[in-house]
A protein has these predicted regions:
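Ubiquitin-like/PB1-type beta-grasp interaction modules and other compact soluble beta-rich domains
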Residues: 2-176
Length: 176
C-alpha cells in the first residue's frame, strides 16, 4: 500500500511538473527591462508578427516583421517596429490613416476619417486557424499578444473591408 501511495505521489508530482513546463512557455512574462527587438519576416518562435500590405494601389512590397519583447497596444507596435504611422487631425491616435507615408498626403490629407473614395487601411488579427480576421477594435485599444499576428491592408474603393493582407500566416507559439 505504501509503495502505491508513493508511486501515486511521484506520478502526480511529475504530471504537475510537466503541466507547469508546458504552460510556462505560453504564459511567460515579457521582461520589460529588455527593449523590443525587430527581425525581418514572420515570427517563428516568439513575438508578434506585424504585416503591412500596401494593397493593389501600390508597388511597395509588403512589410513583414517579427517584434519581440513588446508589451503594449497595437498602435505602439508600429513604433517598436520602426514604422511611421499617422492618424487623422481629428483622431491622431485613434484611426490609422497613413503607414510609412502611404497613401501620400496628396491622395489623402488625413484631416478627417478617410472615406472610401480614396481608400483606407483595414486592420486584421491572426486566428488559431492561421487565417486573417478583420479586427472589431482599433489599434489604439487592442493589446498586443505574443503569438498573435497583426496585419494591415490598404483597401481601394470597392474592395471589401474583409479583404485581408496577402501574406500567409504561420503558426507559432510564444517562447519569449
Amino acid at each position: 500500500m505504501r509503495s502505491f501511495v508513493r508511486l501515486s505521489l511521484i506520478g502526480l508530482v511529475i504530471l504537475v511538473a510537466i503541466g507547469f513546463a508546458l504552460n510556462s512557455n505560453q504564459n511567460q512574462a515579457i521582461d520589460e527591462s529588455i527593449p523590443a527587438s525587430v527581425e525581418a519576416g514572420m515570427c517563428l518562435d516568439a513575438g508578434t508578427s506585424l504585416v503591412v500590405d500596401y494593397g493593389s494601389a501600390s508597388d511597395k512590397p509588403a512589410e513583414v516583421m517579427c517584434v519581440k519583447n513588446f508589451k503594449g497596444y497595437s498602435w505602439d507596435l508600429f513604433e517598436a517596429a520602426e514604422l511611421l504611422v499617422s492618424g487623422t487631425d481629428k483622431y491622431p491616435v485613434g484611426f490609422v490613416c497613413r503607414i510609412e507615408n502611404f497613401p501620400s498626403e496628396e491622395v489623402e490629407p488625413c484631416s478627417e476619417t478617410p472615406g472610401t473614395k480614396n481608400g483606407s487601411w483595414a486592420y486584421f488579427l491572426g486566428d488559431e486557424n492561421n487565417s486573417w480576421v478583420y479586427s472589431p477594435i482599433g489599434a489604439s485599444t487592442h493589446k498586443v499578444k505574443c503569438g498573435v499576428s497583426e496585419g494591415w491592408r490598404f483597401l481601394l474603393p470597392g474592395e471589401s473591408i474583409q479583404t485581408p493582407p496577402r501574406i500567409s500566416l504561420k503558426s507559432y507559439g510564444c517562447n519569449n
